[in-house]
Amino acid sequence: MVVLHETVYSLSSALNTFMTPHPRDEDQVSYHTLVGQDGRVLDLVDPLSRAYGAGYSAFLGEWAITNKKLKGSVNNFALHLSMETPPSGANAYGSHAGYTTQQYDALALVLSGWIRSFNLPPAAITTHRHVDLGGERGDPRSFDGSKLQTRLAALGDLCVS
C-alpha cells in the first residue's frame, strides 16, 4: 500500500527534520520519497526498508505492532510519499493553494513504478488522512484525486480514491 502525505513546510525543512536524530520510536519520521513543487523526486528511504510516515494507523483494518509500548501502524507494510506543501500551507488550516502540475506528473510516475514493481492494486493508494486512527492528520490537504487518476489512467494504471 501507499500512503500520500504533505510536508507542511518546505522541502528543505522536511529534509532537515529527517537529518535530525530521533532515537525514540515514537519520534521517528521519514518518507520513502519526497516530491518538490518543481516536480523534483527525492528518494530518501529504500522502498524495501521501513519508513516512519504514519503513527497510529490502519488500512482496511490491517496494522502491525513492532513496539509493544506503541499503538499499531501501517509503517511495516506501507510506502510513504510526501508532496512539498506550497507556501500558503505553512499553517494549521484545512487547505492551501494546492499542488503543482509538476507534482501531480511526478507523483503519477512514481506511483506507476511502484504499482508495477510491487504489484500493488491501485486501490491500495490512500492518504494519511484515511489511515490515521488518532484523527489528528488531514494530509495531504487540498489534494485533488481526480488529477492523479487522470495521470495514472494515461499511464495505464487506475487509482480508486
Report residues per predicted region.
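N-terminal catalytic cores of peptidoglycan-degrading enzymes
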Residues: M1-G72
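Basic/polar, cationic surfaces and motifs that engage anionic cell-wall
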Residues: N76-H80, E84-S161
